Curated annotation (Swiss-Prot):
Stretches for region G3: 453-456
GO cellular component: cytosol
Gene of this entry: infB
Ranges where the tr-type G domain occurs: 398-565
Annotated Polar residues bias: 36-47, 73-87, 296-308
Region (G2): 432-436
Protein name per its UniProtKB record: Translation initiation factor IF-2
Entry keyword set: Cytoplasm, GTP-binding, Initiation factor, Nucleotide-binding, Protein biosynthesis
Major location (coarse): cytoplasm
Stretch list, region Disordered: 31-227, 240-310
Subcellular location: Cytoplasm
């Protein structure tokens, strides 16, 4: 074969020249489009392509085989509104098979033979099982057919008996009706026959009389006349007889048609006879064919009736309901329109919309009312699975006690703890009042104790209650000079509700007015009995200022903890409770967690209420970074997605993704439940709000440094609300005051309250531009007092009348311009010109008006004091008499307060 160029070879084999050059290059042959290609190079290229693409081997069989396959399918995906949509799915598969050696072929052949034998045996076994199953199914089908046949025969027998019975009853009724109609028809026919007979006899008598007269007058024509009379009689009798027989025949035919059985529609016999007979008693029904023909209405037997019977009830189904559900979703689950669900709820007394969220109980009542079976969905399956995968161990060890110090304001709680810790904590709190829950652990000679210092102010009830729930022992600090105070009683109630033992520390025994015995007597009224009186409570007399008997208090705490035998799981995944939380600028959300079991380590994944995250850093109460914390150790953790609520449970889990899902589920559940309750409260309070009318509102935007302070302040502000002024917290949050808070305050006409926080630069600029009211506080007393004052300014003022002067009329003069002028002597106070007056006669008010003129001698004056004479002109009143009294008063506006 002669050599050809690469370009000619490409045209010959029908491939692009670039691709052919690339194939030459892959085969190790460098060519250009104008170069010649020899036979050897062609053979080399062919060998390379066969090796590359699975060409034929030496025996002519291919060594590589590539298969491509496409499959198309349709997938139904559920959409909104209960509808589904179809999605086209294309699956592409590509497989390459390479020929193996002869040994592998033999092994594969043996394997294939073995596999075929196994498959054959399996198919035979399946066929045998299938035949057995077919036989069993055939027997069951035959049995069901026999049962159905017997059931149908029974039902047919019952139906036939019922049909025969109904036919017999209808036949009896028709027979009675026919007999009644027949008797009436025969009576009417007899009357008509008698009338016709009587008429015919009268006609014949008249004709005979005429014939006799004619015979007498004309004897010749007798024979002809007699014949005519006879013919007329026969003719008359013929017509009368014919009509009578015709009517009888027609009536007989009607009776036959009436008694043809159940095929003719049943009608009252009397009505049928009256409808069918017209003038002269003849049957007026059209018996001819054509469009006007009235066909008899025939009812088929009951067993032979056919027709479409619309199902009266919808198909009942099982409805799965979660914690909350939207009305439209509930309608989709029940396969009904949303309007039907809304109608059902309106009948039950609830007004809802199609997109409204309803709670589980309401949805269950609606579904059961509409005849469906309700299945309550277990919403927290993922949460339970996540909690069960924590791998907790059962090895428990003794742990340090968690002690909460409670008591009234300024009774020395923080000072006692301060002396124990050898640090001045109280000086760091604003006004010496504890605003947060301080958590500290103290190392002493015999072990370790964790202290929780709770605020004593009444506004921090929720924080104090959380402290009691997380503690093992409560130390109640009572001042020896003050005794039992309101917050002391509240702390006792929290300790009893939590079921924790109570140790009483009688503080300030170094003061002159200290009376520890009086404290014992007062506490005995609340079932706090000292041990020396036979009770269970330990009383320790201390002085936090001097440090007196502090060691005795610690020994009492350790003694009580030994009695309780406190244990916890030390190793394993940690769990605890959030004591406090806040947003730290630069570090983000910070939560103070008291570890209750396990060991919390840096890098653990924590699920904390509605928030989650990985522990990026851990700090102790002194601000030092630590790597781990065991049971009864309070720590600050960083890395959560948001600020958790104080009192939430903090749990370490394994999977970050599942923790995020559980947190999102909790947030959605919290939001749905909140919306459902909010809607319910709106409906319930709608009429009460309409009746109450307009009420002044004091809107507040509240920002604080920690979550507990927000709860305490918001609760205190809500308690300030009265019937005339309501306090409404339109926005609250942890952290500094931002521009968003300022915008919210401007939109709602609210004042901004910052508790231990400050506003940033954009927020201050916005506040200045909008002229908003921004106030900073560090002590809760001042905040509550100023809000109370602001609410007092919103109250409607009170007006009071105050008498400033009294004048007695001594004489009356007449003036042409003014009228009656009263000459008076001022007996009390001062008479002023521009004030309103009252005229009293015998101590009874007879007129109320104003002064028109006030003169002393001839000069006008503005006021006349006690003991002087004056002339008074009363405007629009001339009936002034001697002896009357003129009382001058003024209206004073008094600003009301909430106290």
């Amino acid at each position: 074969m002669s050599e050809v160029t690469v370009k000619a070879l490409a045209e010959e084999v029908g491939t692009p020249i670039d691709r052919l050059l690339q194939q030459f290059s892959d085969a190790g042959i460098s060519k250009k489009a104008e170069d010649n290609v020899s036979q050897t190079e062609k053979q080399s290229l062919l060998s390379h392509l066969q090796k590359e693409h699975g060409g034929e081997s030496t025996d002519g069989t291919p060594t590589r085989l590539t298969l491509q396959r496409k499959t198309h399918s349709t997938l139904s995906v559920a959409g909104t509104g209960g509808k589904s949509k179809s999605v086209q799915v294309e699956v592409r598969k590509k497989r390459t098979f390479v020929k193996r050696s002869a040994l592998e072929e033999e092994q594969r052949a043996a394997d294939n033979a073995k596999q075929e034998a196994e498959e054959t045996a399996q198919r035979e076994a399946e066929n045998v099982a299938k035949r057995k199953e077919d036989v069993r199914l055939a027997e069951e089908k035959a049995k069901r057919d026999e049962e159905n046949k017997a059931k149908r025969n029974t039902e047919d027998t019952v139906k036939r008996e019922a049909t025969d019975k109904r036919k017999a009853e209808e036949k009896a009724k028709r027979t009675v009706a026919v007999k009644q109609a027949k008797s009436e028809t025969e009576l009417l026919q007899l009357r008509r026959e008698e009338e016709a007979k009587r008429k015919a006899e009268e006609d014949s008598q008249r004709q005979l009389e005429e014939a006799r007269k004619m015979a007498e007058t004309n004897e010749k024509n007798w024979s002809a006349t007699e014949q005519n009379v006879t013919a007329n009689m026969e003719k008359s009798d013929y017509h009368v007889t014919t009509s009578t027989h015709a009517r009888a025949a027609e009536d007989e035919q009607d009776r036959k048609e009436e008694t043809t059985g159940t095929r003719r529609k049943k009608k009252p016999a009397a009505k049928k006879a009256d409808d069918r007979k017209g003038r002269g008693g003849r049957n007026q029904r059209n018996q001819r064919g054509g469009r006007g023909k009235q066909k008899p209405q025939v009812n088929a037997p009951t067993s032979m009736q056919q027709g479409f019977d619309k199902t009266a009830t919808v198909a009942k189904s099982d409805v799965v309901i979660g914690e909350t559900i939207v009305v439209s979703e509930l309608a989709n689950k029940m396969a009904v329109k949303a309007t039907e669900v809304i109608k059902a709820m309106m009948k039950m007394g609830a007004m809802v919309t199609i997109n409204q969220v309803i709670d589980q109980e309401t949805a269950a009542l609606v579904a059961e009312e509409m005849g469906h079976k309700v299945i309550f969905r277990k919403e927290n399956e993922l949460e339970e699975a996540l909690m069960s995968d924590r791998g907790e161990t059962q090895a428990v060890e003794s742990r340090a006690p968690v002690v909460t110090i409670m008591g009234h304001v300024d009774h020395g709680k923080t000072s006692t703890l301060d002396f124990i810790r050898k640090a001045h904590v109280a000086s760091g709190e604003a006004g010496g009042i504890t605003q947060h829950i301080g958590a500290y652990h103290v190392e002493i000679g015999n072990g370790m104790i964790t202290f929780l210092d709770t605020p004593g102010h009444a506004a921090f009830t929720a924080m104090r209650a959380r402290g009691a729930q997380a503690t093992d022992i409560v130390v109640l600090v009572v001042a020896a000079d003050d005794g039992v105070m309101p917050q002391t009683v509240e702390a006792i109630q929290h300790a009893k509700a939590a079921g924790v033992p109570l140790i009483v520390a009688v503080n300030k025994i170094d003061k002159d007015g200290a009376n520890p015995d009086n404290v014992k007597n007062e506490l005995a009224q609340y079932d706090i009995i000292p041990e020396e009186w036979g009770g269970e409570n330990i009383f320790v007399h201390i002085s936090a200022k001097q440090g007196t008997n502090i060691d005795g208090l610690l020994e009492a705490i350790l003694l009580q903890s030994e009695i309780l035998e406190l244990t916890a799981v030390k190793e394993g995944m940690a769990s605890g409770v959030v004591i406090e939380s806040r947003i730290d600028k630069g570090r983000g959300p910070v939560a103070t967690v008291l570890v209750q079991s396990g060991t919390l380590r840096k890098g653990d994944i924590v699920l904390c209420g509605l928030e989650h995250g990985r522990v990026r850093a851990m700090r102790d109460e002194n601000g030092k970074d630590i790597e781990s914390a065991g049971p009864s150790i309070p720590v600050e953790i960083l890395g959560l997605s948001g600020v958790p609520a104080a009192g939430d449970e903090a749990t370490v889990v394994r999977d970050d993704r599942k923790a995020r899902e559980v947190a999102l589920y909790r947030q959605g559940k919290f939001r749905d439940v909140k919306l459902a309750r909010q809607q319910k409260s709106k409906l319930e309070n709608m009429f009460s709000h309409m009746e109450a009318g307009e009420v002044a509102e004091c809107n507040v935007v509240l920002k604080a440094d920690v979550q507990g302070s927000i709860e305490a302040i918001a609760d205190s502000l809500m308690k300030l609300s009265t019937d005339e002024v309501k306090v409404k917290v339109v926005g609250s949050g942890v952290g500094g005051i931002t521009e968003t808070d300022a915008v919210l305050a401007a939109a709602s006409n609210a004042i901004i309250l910052g508790f231990n926080v400050r506003a940033d630069v954009p927020a201050r600029r916005m506040i200045e531009n909008e002229n908003l009211d921004l106030r900073y506080y560090s002590v809760i007393y001042q905040l509550i007092d100023e809000v109370k004052a602001a609410m007092g300014g919103m109250l409607a003022p009170e007006f009071r009348q105050e008498i400033i002067g009294l004048a007695e009329v001594r004489d009356v003069f007449k003036s042409p311009k003014i009228g009656a002028i009263a000459g008076c002597m001022v007996t009390e106070g001062t008479i002023k010109r521009n004030n309103p007056i009252r005229v009293l006669r015998d101590n009874v008010v007879i007129y109320e008006g104003e002064l028109e003129s006030l003169r002393r001698f001839k000069d006008d004056t503005n006021e006349v004091k006690n003991g002087y004479e004056c002339g008074i002109g009363v405007k629009n009143y001339n009936d002034v008499r001697v002896g009357d009294q003129i009382e001058v008063f003024e209206i004073i506006e008094i600003q009301r307060t909430l106290d």
